[in-house]
Amino acid sequence: MSDIELIDSHCHLIFDNFEEDLEDVVLRFRSRSVKKLVHACCEFSEIPKLKKISHEFDEIYYSVGLHPLEAKKWEPSSKSTLRRSAQEDRRVVAIGELGLDFFKSENKTQQIEALIPQMELAY
């Protein structure tokens, strides 16, 4: 397996269950040929911590965005906040986590209002 280099394109490393052992998590993925990871940002408050860990560990990159279940947090200034975050840090490699999620939520209008500007940034 050492000849194969893996990239995890969607992970969540700053959730509470990793807070105490992030360094151990890094050692485990390194030992399993995972060369890069992209943490999918769910809300704006995660961005400073994502920036910090991505600069601590060379393998970690991240996206900036707002998960559809957090769409109520979208504000008129949100698009410029995401744009600035993406432009300021070379470790940002995507916009998201974005989309529509009607499984747990009925805020369809809010989700669409948050989705469109994020898609514009990603384009």
Model regions and ranges:
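Mid-domain alpha/beta scaffold segments of enzyme catalytic cores
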Residues: 1-123
